[in-house]
Amino acid sequence: MQIRRRPPSVAVNVQELQYQVKTPENEPRNILEKIVWFKETEVEQMRDSVSLLDLRKQVANCEPPLSFLDALKHGKTQPALIAEVKKASPSKGVLRENFDPVAIAQAYEAAGASCLSVLTDAEFFQGSFDYLQQIRAAVSLPLLCKEFVIYPYQIYLARSRGADAVLLIAAILSDQDLTYFLKIIKSLGMTALVEVHTLPELERVMDIPGIELIGINNRDLETFTVDLEVTCQLLAQQGTSLQDQDILVVSESGLHTSADLAQVKQAGAGAVLIGESLVKETGNASTHSETEQMQAKISALFS
């Protein structure tokens, strides 16, 4: 399904009230479309607060980004681990009430993660660009800004807050947008993680020059259902071509056990992105430190 952008508003004003008739054309058809439509309004408001010109000035004063891709290629674990700082999701609600993003990030680093992913969407995932900035000041690992990017503004915002890599979701971007955004990301010295869910999406992005890192999301963002076979099936179809193009593949979502990791590693994934199973508190949270808990979880996953 093609994810649409928000159609122009056709509203009727009656005195001080405004009405709009709901039709299939002006209502989002799924969760992903709802998020994208919200982002359009959100970014407009962000621009009113801080201009793109001001953001670019901030970026010019940032330290050079770290190499996200190199960190994955030389990861401490196999497959390499991108550990995600994530408070909530539309499908599962709040994953952790006692949420300290910096403490979680530091525990991930101590437990052997190669890179970190930080949710920055506030409306649907209770994330924050402030979290990204705070984590950048606290850890030395490369950081991925996990965001629904539809405008260049968001890329510059991510870099200004310390991101070394940015997520680009193929389902919500045209080939033209992907190509343009990749050029911006490369010009900033950052890495793009281009995410796909279907074989047509994978084949489409493989034809776009300059892509070095592809994420296969086992979660359908239209329905939020998860199936690990997505990674296996796509790599069975295109794994050899991906290797020939020297593209590293990240398997994302639905990874909870060592058997899950073994399955996607066998399929050809060079890295995994894990959030929910690491962030959720365990029964012994009160007797073990954050780092001890994380080391135990990661050790169990990679055993």
From Swiss-Prot:
The keyword Amino-acid biosynthesis applies. GO terms for molecular function: indole-3-glycerol-phosphate synthase activity; phosphoribosylanthranilate isomerase activity. SUPFAM superfamilies: Ribulose-phoshate binding barrel. Belongs to the TrpC family. Signal peptide: none annotated. GO terms for biological process: L-tryptophan biosynthetic process. CDD domains: IGPS (cd00331). The keyword Amino-acid biosynthesis applies. It catalyses: 1-(2-carboxyphenylamino)-1-deoxy-D-ribulose 5-phosphate + H(+) = (1S,2R)-1-C-(indol-3-yl)glycerol 3-phosphate + CO2 + H2O. It comes from the Bacteria. InterPro entries: Aldolase_TIM (IPR013785), Indole-3-glycerol_P_synth (IPR045186), Indole-3-glycerol_P_synth_dom (IPR013798), Indole-3-GlycerolPSynthase_CS (IPR001468), RibuloseP-bd_barrel (IPR011060). PANTHER family: INDOLE-3-GLYCEROL-PHOSPHATE SYNTHASE, TRYPTOPHAN BIOSYNTHESIS PROTEIN. Pathway: Amino-acid biosynthesis; L-tryptophan biosynthesis; L-tryptophan from chorismate: step 4/5. Keywords: Amino-acid biosynthesis, Aromatic amino acid biosynthesis, Decarboxylase, Lyase, Tryptophan biosynthesis. PROSITE patterns: IGPS. Its EC number is 4.1.1.48. This is Indole-3-glycerol phosphate synthase.
